[in-house]
Regions:
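An N-terminal assembly and electron-transfer interface module characteristic of large anaerobic redox
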Residues: 1-505
Length: 505
């Protein structure tokens, strides 16, 4: 509103003060600049923090005053408002729909679901480092790292020449919360216009700006199946991979079952879905493994993109496996359940509606219905652990933080760490984008508390951004694993002493 007022009044000049590290300022500064420059006005921004030298600010202000003194008042003539391009029913038949990569296993199956219902969706493979440079070129560098990764990848795909911009649309997931991810669509549209693709429609898979896209009940059911299948496949693969007797067995079995999961989604019935889960778990449970002691288990938690996206976290999972760890990845389905809990918490703690709470509970029941076959199969296995309910996750988090922390990953991030510790996984890597304030509170902010509550917890926080040092990250992981191995050795010696004592007695 201030920018509009200054733009419409030639005798008013606007100076915006931006706080260093304030996430929302990365969005508002771009929008204020756009409003003023569209009206041919000068935009001035001063970035301040507790150690700022006001000398630089004085120079900027003097420069502004000198420019205003020499400048003629702009003769601005307002132009008609141009609406953004929309995703229409015609686009469904004609357009290729680009969607960003986030979690490779899960999105391979989500792509199958959308194609089944007539959407020509393409989810590009894991991007390269140069794609992040494209994001840095067109996105405010103070914006959170996931936005730079996602937008950089999509722009790189459009610039590759593989797609006709006039017949291409982009699909994103809109969270509609306090997280900056709610604004990714506006940031992406601005980047598309700057890169020369203003005609490309951007719409939401879920959120406010869905345009002509509709999530039908059959599509929702298939998406739930895809998420559960991918979670189960990921859990089984990660458990057997460090112990495989014949190198490559885990990878071959993973590829085999991923293809079966695709076919199950494309044309399988509910009975086939349940059979696929049972047989997949049984196959991994029977896979030949080396008879060696359990390796250090390391849980990976954090912001959803940097947790699952290989490039965004510098291929963390591969690094941990290469260092001799067993990687424990939280389940993707739990994130959707966490989002559904918002309406429950708003009703219980704030001013939320009862109808929204009931709708969320129904949604949770539907997801749990599709997860029931996986839970049963994992419980019957000898190697794998079954997932706990989202209500149990809420209870675990409420020990340490208020459930009112709903921005970003909120209380769910704390719940993931507590759940891992309660299940015996004491080594945890907590990932967050640099400057992600909500996750710094419920991630980094609770680590000290968790260490006090669980003295054996070995938790390492790692910030991810475009300039993060891979060497520094690797050194921190090696230090964490050294502590983990020492703890494993100490426990083994203690158990051996106990056995020796019992034998002597």
């Amino acid at each position: 509103h201030a920018a509009e007022f200054a733009a419409e009044n030639p005798d008013v000049t606007l100076i915006q003060l931006s706080s260093f590290g304030c996430g929302l300022d990365a969005i508002t500064t771009d929008q204020v600049r756009s409003v003023l420059e569209d009206h041919w006005r000068i935009y001035t921004m001063l970035k301040l923090d507790e150690v700022s030298n006001l000398g630089a600010a004085r120079i900027r202000l003097r420069s502004l005053l000198a420019a205003l003194a020499r400048r003629q008042p702009p003769a601005f003539e307002p132009e008609g408002f141009t609406d953004r391009p929309h995703f229409t029913r015609e686009c469904k038949a004609q357009h290729t729909i680009l969607a960003p990569q986030l979690a490779p296993i899960h999105f391979a199956l989500f792509e199958t679901v959308l194609r089944k219902y007539g959407y020509r969706v393409v989810i590009p493979p894991t991007p390269e480092r140069k794609d992040i440079d494209v994001g840095l070129e067109y996105v405010n560098n103070d914006m959170c790292y996931p936005a730079i990764v996602i937008i950089g990848q999509l722009l790189a795909e459009l610039r590759s020449g593989k797609y006709d911009p006039d017949n291409t649309s982009i699909m994103l997931f809109q969270t509609c919360g306090a997280c900056r991810a709610t604004n990714y669509m506006a940031v992406l549209r601005r980047a598309l216009a700057a890169a020369g693709f203003p005609q490309v429609p951007v719409f939401a898979f879920h959120g406010i700006e869905t345009d002509a896209f509709r999530m039908t009940k059959p599509m929702l059911c298939d998406a739930a199946k895809a998420s559960v299948l991918a979670d189960t496949l990921m859990t089984c693969r990660n458990r057997v991979l460090p112990y495989e007797k014949n190198p490559g067995d885990a990878r071959r079995m993973f590829d085999h079952w991923l293809e079966i999961c695709r076919k199950t989604i494309e044309g399988g019935s509910g009975r086939e879905y349940r059979r696929t889960i049972r047989e997949m778990v049984a196959a991994f449970d029977a896979m030949p493994l080396r008879d060696i002691p359990r390796k250090p288990r390391v849980g990976v938690v954090g912001e959803i993109l940097v947790k699952y996206h290989p490039l965004a976290n510098n291929h963390l999972e591969e690094e941990l496996e290469g260092e001799g760890a067993e990687v424990i990845m939280p389940l993707f389905t739990d994130f959707f359940l966490y989002l559904a809990c918002d309406n429950i918490i708003r009703h219980d703690l704030l001013d939320g509606k009862l109808s929204a709470k009931i709708a969320s509970k129904i949604f949770i029941s539907v997801l749990e219905y599709f997860r029931k076959p996986a839970r049963k199969a994992l419980e019957r296995s000898s190697r794998f652990e079954a997932p706990c309910s989202i209500y149990e996750m809420m209870r675990l988090a409420s020990r340490h933080v208020s459930l009112g922390n709903m921005a970003g990953e909120g209380w769910f991030l704390t719940a993931e760490m507590v759940r891992l510790i309660d299940s015996g996984v004491m080594n945890i890597v907590c990932l967050q984008p640099f400057g992600c304030l909500p996750n710094h509170i419920t991630g980094k902010g609770v680590i000290h508390l968790l260490r006090e509550s669980y003295p054996g917890a070995n938790i390492v926080p790692i910030d991810c951004d475009s300039g993060s040092s891979e060497v520094n990250q690797l050194n921190r992981l090696k230090l964490m694993l050294t502590v983990a191995r020492e703890e494993n050795r100490r426990k083994a010696e203690s158990e051996e002493e106990e056995r020796s004592g019992q034998h002597s007695a």
